Amino acid sequence: MKVLGIDPSTKTGWALITITDARWSHMSGVQILRGTGFQRVVYAKKWLEEFVHSHTPNLIVIEGYAYANPHTLGTLVEVGTAFRLGMSEEGFGWIDCPPTTLKKFVCGKGTAKKEHILLDVYKHWKVSF
């Protein structure tokens, strides 16, 4: 089974976990979405479509929107919509995961800071990013 997690932004973080029998491996990275406005939307959609076709995940999880910074919300919605539109057009399903749900799963509370999340991921699964 392959699970792809995506944190959509102009610097999109991603992690692909592969589980085979009782073993698992992972790869992760950051994809910088170049351009502005519609140019960036087209690039984002195409990048994710190509990534998904080359890695064929069984499950795609996209982090939902965070509303903390109103100055970046428009860009985040553009990128997130491009990803969701691309997955829909290509016939891939996905799950939206609110940021607070992810934080609560990893740290036990939905308001954890990024540094705390990274530390808890390492403590629980011995993986660092």
PLM ranges: what are they?
Residues 1-129:
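Phosphate- and other anionic-substrate recognition elements at nucleic-acid/protein interfaces
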